Curated annotation (Swiss-Prot):
Pfam families listed in its UniProt record: LRR_6
Residues in LRR repeats: 149-170, 174-195, 202-222, 234-255, 259-280
Record PTM Phosphoserine, positions in chain: S399
Compositional bias per record (Low complexity), positions renumbered to this chain: 396-406
Protein name in the entry: Leucine-rich repeat-containing protein 42
Region (Disordered): 376-406
Length: 421
């Protein structure tokens, strides 16, 4: 401003005219230096030579800078010129809502096509990985769209994701396939209790391989089905392999799964395997398979739905958080220096393929197909004999002592467990 005021004194005002007695006179002619004033006036300059102007944008925040250019799409022509065009109003509104997706009140009744685009936009901005806000946003989608958000969830060997994103995992509804193999759940884990809720009554395939489960965990998981006929009543496939704490008594709790078609109890702590085979066949019609079943090769269970990439983002964030917290190199060097046994920190791998167990050692069961109604008379007679054998075994089991034990078991254990929910 000071420069501008000083520059005003050097500016040439040009010729000045005055009207007097009806005649127009030029004042400059009456002054000294008339010849100089009659010369061509110098061009008017607001700024001197060498003065440059810089257009300053808002540099306080990168987000603000992005918002100013977010309304345009920049492309290049064939000649190499930069060309920009304005985005559609739908894209602008979609981007704004996805940035504030955690503030949505409800999405119930909202069109699925638009909701999927909104979900993808929020996922691209990694809104579901934010603590707190991501959970609130995910709950709005799962409440409104259920299985469209996720119908199959595979968390095999992703115990870090289970530990860090437990509430997010519990928000999923109407899952049909759930793989929790090698997640170290144990009998008292919240997720094991969550399996009995109505939100997961649609689960038909459940993999709980190598989860440190025992008979108590199986009893807790099957209590709602056995007593109130709700929970995992639609379960058709169950994998309980590599849980050595499950004994013959725990297998008895599985008889409440009347729709069970495939069962894997390999690597459990069974004592009388022959008796378990007979009980499974007599109670729920499952037959021991002599060859490994393809249903348990863990190839069909995959994460499917809108949120399939979100699970990968959770895993990436969890691994990075653990790496930042761990600084084990100095400690390892000290352990080697003092000749102590260094603790090996390796990622625990899920024993999907047991090299020590051949096909004959696997305890996998399946349900036989229903026979044709026009079967031979001989097979019908053999069936009748089997039924008589089953009735005799049931009569032996229905002794007063066993009936009393069943009644006491239901009254003391099951009802106490159900009252804790």
């Amino acid at each position: 401003m000071a420069y501008y005021l000083n520059s005003e004194a050097h500016l040439d005002p040009g010729p000045i005219y005055v009207r007097e007695n009806g005649q127009l006179h030029m004042v400059n002619l009456a002054l000294d230096g008339v010849k100089n004033s009659l010369q061509k006036p110098r061009p008017f300059r607001l700024f001197p030579k060498g003065f440059s102007v810089e257009l300053c944008m808002n540099r306080e925040d990168d987000t603000a800078q992005k918002e100013k250019t977010d309304h345009f799409i920049f492309t290049y022509t064939r000649e190499g010129n930069l060309r920009y065009s304005a985005k559609s109003l739908f894209s602008l509104v979609l981007g704004f809502i996805s940035d504030n997706v955690d503030h949505i009140d409800s999405l119930i009744g909202f069109p699925e096509q638009i909701a999927e685009k909104l979900f993808s936009a929020a996922e691209a901005r990694q809104k579901f990985t934010e603590p707190g806000a991501g959970l609130r946003a995910l709950q709005k989608f799962t409440e409104a769209y259920g299985s469209l958000v996720l119908c199959s969830l595979c968390l095999r060997n992703r115990y870090l994701v289970v530990a860090e994103k437990l509430e997010e995992i519990k928000s999923f509804r109407e899952l049909t396939r759930l793989d929790l193999s090698c997640c170290w759940l144990g009998d008292e884990h919240e997720l094991l209790e969550h399996l009995t809720n109505e939100a997961l009554s649609s689960v038909t395939q459940l993999h709980l391989k190598d989860n440190c489960l025992s008979d108590a965990g199986i009893r807790k998981m099957t209590a709602p089905v056995r007593v109130m006929k709700r929970g995992l009543e639609n379960l058709a496939l169950l994998d309980l392999s590599c849980n050595p704490e499950i004994t013959d008594a725990g297998i008895g709790y599985l008889f409440s799964f009347r729709k069970l078609n495939c069962l894997d109890i390999s690597g459990t702590g069974l004592k009388d395997i022959k008796a378990v085979k007979d009980k499974l066949r007599a109670n729920i019609g499952l037959v021991h398979s002599k060859v490994p079943l393809k249903e348990f090769d863990h190839s069909n269970c995959k994460t499917e739905g809108w949120a399939d990439q979100i699970v990968l983002q959770w895993e990436r964030v969890s691994v990075e958080a653990v790496r930042q917290r761990k600084d084990v190199e100095p400690r390892k060097a000290a352990q080697y220096f003092y000749q102590n046994r260094a603790r090996t920190e390796v990622t625990r791998k899920c024993p999907l393929a047991e090299t020590h167990m051949n096909s004959s050692g696997k305890l996998q069961f399946y349900r036989e197909e229903a026979p044709d109604c026009h079967e031979p008379l001989l097979s019908q007679e053999s069936k009748k004999s089997k039924k008589r054998a089953f009735k005799e075994s049931e009569q032996e089991q229905s002794s007063p002592q066993s009936a009393k034990q069943k009644c006491v078991c239901l009254a003391v254990e099951d009802w106490d467990l159900l009252n804790s929910y």
